[in-house]
């Protein structure tokens, strides 16, 4: 399965990663690469728990997250 993740750099260093379609599925890492590896494992565990509980696993619709820069005056 493929999921969109949001990777955010923390002010004090490191990165936090969330998965919008999987509420509460969050991970972190000291580097981007570590954070992304960690979220892959978190997603796998999240889905395993859902299946064990008899819940259906969300399938993400095709989405695009686009960043827009604006000038505020």
PLM features: residue spans?
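Short, charged, surface-exposed hinge/linker loops at domain edges
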Residues: 1-3, 37-73
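Short aromatic-glycine-(Arg/Gly/Cys) micro-motifs in beta-strand/loop hairpins
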Residues: 7-22
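Intrinsically disordered, low-complexity regions
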Residues: 14-15, 30, 55
């Amino acid at each position: 399965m493929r999921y969109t993740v949001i990777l955010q750099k923390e002010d004090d260093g490191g990165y936090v990663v969330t998965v919008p379609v999987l509420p509460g599925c969050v991970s972190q890492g000291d580097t981007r690469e570590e954070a992304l590896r960690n979220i892959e494992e978190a997603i796998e565990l999240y889905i395993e728990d859902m299946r064990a509980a008899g819940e259906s696993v969300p399938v993400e619709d095709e989405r695009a997250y686009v960043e827009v820069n604006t000038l505020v005056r």
